[in-house]
Amino acid sequence: MSQVDINHARALVYQLLSSLFAREVDEQRLKELTSEAAQQFWEQLSLEAKLTQSVDKIRSTLNGIKDDETLLELAADYCGLFLVGTKHSASPYASLYLSGEDEPLLFGQQHQQMSEFLHQSKLQVQSHFPEPADHLAVMLAYMAHLCCHSEDSVQLSFLQTCVDSWLAKFINQLTQCDKNGFYSAVAILTLAWVKQDIAQLEPAEAVIS
């Protein structure tokens, strides 16, 4: 597999994770996520030992949705966890976890930083997604873009500074609120994937000097 193919595959994983945080799973998305091609994708992802448990939870949840009621329950989980903004939710914005303020504001420093990154890459948050730019879905979508358009050093810096720096805190909050465990599994998978990607992107230490 060429480096171009590897980067494309990495981008697909980031795009998938981004989509799961961007909106609730509807009927059409469920069909896509449980299609034959998707099953092969999940299977391939689960071969990595550190990803297996999270992938299995995600797959079992998606494959277990057989009626509208169960699908609506998953949609309700998404809304309750990410859209309500109470102590029983886990807002997916970097600003809320990286700010030193007691009551951090949305559209803060991390939002401004991400907006600048997007502007430099001639990208923008779509109008149908009216969220601050430091939303996890935006960051993961941007990383998918970087996989195919930027040097490894740029990708590594972005992951370490803008993503890995707060994901663990987000997961800690999310796991306390997520009774059904689907979105916790998605978040844990995201962190494990990011950690693995960072390890791959870090320059190898010289054997001799």
Curated annotation (Swiss-Prot):
Major place of localization?
Answer: cytoplasm
Q: Which Gene3D superfamilies match?
A: 1.20.120.1820, HscB, C-terminal domain
Q: Which UniProt keywords apply?
A: Chaperone, Cytoplasm
One cellular component term (GO) for this entry is: cytoplasm
Where in the cell does this protein reside? Cytoplasm
Q: Which family does it belong to?
A: Belongs to the TorD/DmsD family. TorD subfamily.
Kindly provide the name given to this protein in its UniProt entry. Answer: Chaperone protein TorD
Organism name: Shewanella baltica (strain OS185)
Q: What is the lineage of its organism?
A: Bacteria, Pseudomonadati, Pseudomonadota, Gammaproteobacteria, Alteromonadales
Q: Which gene encodes it?
A: torD
